[in-house]
Regions:
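Short strand-connecting beta-turns/loops that link adjacent beta-strands
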Residues: 58-60, 90, 160
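Short beta-strand segments
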Residues: 33-68
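Short, structured beta-strand-loop surface elements
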Residues: 11-12, 68-158
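A short, polar/charged loop/turn motif at coil->beta-strand junctions and beta-hairpin connectors
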Residues: 30-34, 149
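A generic local structural motif
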Residues: 23-24, 50-51, 139-141
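General secondary-structure edge motif
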Residues: 5, 18, 25, 57-58, ...
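Extreme N-terminal tail/first-helix region
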Residues: 1-30
Length: 161
């Protein structure tokens, strides 16, 4: 199935508002499930921009996905190709490699569904409810459509900050 990326220049308003709170709590060091702070250089301003993102970590590899489509952090990360992630109080500098359609399809089909399946019951329920709420059910049910609509980046270590 082919599809064009969703035109989602901004996340839903409830997400934008909750992101500010989530970012503040993460900066205070409160654990927020798989959420980490992504800081990337702005593609126009060059200034550091931070956003909370969910980090999928399995078998020593790490990915982040643009669950809301082409949001600003996705565009900035594409332009910069690198970022800092704050994980459990440690900041790491990473290279971000965007997956192509075939690799992203495999990520949604194999990696993400297995990752969500290993979450505690509440985590699984939360993930499924969130994807339904933001009209992104295909993330767990249609890997080809998810890959066409939602960018995925693998994060490769470049060093600690």
């Amino acid at each position: 199935m082919t599809s064009t990326p969703i035109d989602a220049s901004t996340a839903p308003s409830f997400v934008r508002h909750s992101n500010r709170i989530t970012l503040g709590l993460l900066r205070l060091g409160l654990p927020m499930g798989p959420n980490v702070i992504l800081t990337v250089r702005g593609r126009t301003s060059g200034l550091p921009r931070s956003a909370p993102v969910a980090l999928v970590e399995t078998d020593g590899r790490r990915w982040i996905l643009g669950a809301y489509g082409e949001v600003n952090w996705v565009r900035n990360l594409r332009a910069a190709g690198e970022a800092d992630i704050a994980v459990h109080g440690r900041t790491e500098h990473v290279e971000a490699v965007e997956l192509d359609q075939v690799s992203a399809t495999a990520f949604f089909r194999d990696t993400l569904t297995a990752y969500v399946g290993r979450l505690p019951r509440f985590g699984r329920l939360f993930a499924r409810t969130l994807f339904r709420t933001i009209s992104a059910e295909e993330i767990l049910t249609d890997p080809e459509l998810a890959a066409a609509r939602r960018p995925v980046f693998e994060l490769l270590p470049l060093g600690r900050c």
